Amino acid sequence: MTPVVVVGGVLTALGVVRSLASAGIPVYLACDTRFCPAGLSRQCTLLRVPDLEGQGLVDGLLSIAGRIGEKAVLILSSDVQVLAVSQARAALEAHYFLALPTKTMVDVLMDKAKFQAYAEEIGLRVPRAVVLDEGHDERALDVLSMPVVVKPVDRALVQAGVERTTRADTVAEARTVARRMRRATSSVVVQEWIDGDDDDMCFTLFVCDGQARIVALFTGRKMICDPPLVGSTAVCVAATEEHQALAAQTQAFVTRSHYHGIGGLEFKRHRRTGQVVVVEPTVGRADGQEEIATLCGVNIPAIAYRTALGLPVESVGAVDTAIAWRASFRYRPRAGTLPPGTRIVDGYFRRADPLPGVYSLYTYLRTSAPARLARRFVKQPRSRPAAEPIHEMQPSTIGG
């Protein structure tokens, strides 16, 4: 059976590994360390690569291809991986089945400024926005209604934790945030804020074949984000009630962009007007909350695998709406938020695959406030310096 190589070690990759393994697909994990959530899973075989971005990733993928011994399907889990693979697709296509939009479209969709212009051009409903860079001064903010959200154009900075999407309530605050961000990136996008709570944010997860036809599509709703309103998905559920409307917008997007492969769109409904707008796409990779689809009966990674190989895909049955996925045990929905009988599945903890959960708990205890406080008051022996804390890996922000 043709194997699949999943790239990356964070929670996103772990969800993909478990989804593929549940379909009986042999899974390799390309990662630079075993000590990460996906690397500790018993449901994949680890193959070390020197880096998870840039030429180091490309060289690593070419190296492990020889060890695998046959052409494998490749599934990515971060934006920097997509950029590296897209640039090197000519070298990688001999060893991997790649399913990506064209190089030009990857560049457009992954740059927030270019995506804003492209979305407006093809008629996608997106929040009004301006770009601040060397060619556009801060007076451009005057055309926007406050509050706004300020985002680095380079999405890799968000995934790397260098910057985060930030809300600004006044023009002065927006200027301050934009100036700070521009110390790390040359351009920022400033979007008008869409009024609503965490649960007004929905998403679609999909797979397209080489003719830009949607082979599978799942619609979900965020229940908790971290940080609230602007952060990554912490808890989410299926959103069958939104499927028809969001599927139509997703279809328009994939048709116009000639999309190929795995991807996603994030939406937000304006609480007062009811209008739904596209916030941003997930391009060429699995989403942070990808596993919710699998848990509800739509195994997006497994369908992406079969589609990449040109194999037929079985029709998807009824979506199980009595399941919620959460990124960590630290997130607890308020009473009454979820329907009675909803089963919450933790992204890390599984009885049949326990080590990722142990890793999650260990990193939480090592980095939590009580642990930091205790270490301040416990005198460390001079002969045994304290070990470096292991920081918990966070799920990807884009789309998630």
Annotate each PLM feature.
Residues 169-172, 192-258, 282-308:
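ATP-dependent carboxylate/phosphate-activation module, predominantly the ATP-grasp catalytic core
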Residues 148, 213-215, 275-280:
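Protein kinase-like catalytic core scaffold
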Residues 305-400:
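Peripheral (often C-terminal) accessory segments that flank ATP-dependent C-N-forming ligase machineries
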Residues 1-101, 135-139, 370-398:
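ATP-binding N-terminal substructure of ATP-dependent carboxylate-amine bond-forming enzymes
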Residues 272-331:
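Active-site/pore-lining binding-face segments in mid-to-C-terminal subdomains
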Residues 192, 260-272:
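A short glycine-rich, hydrophobically flanked beta-strand micro-motif that places a catalytic Asp/Glu
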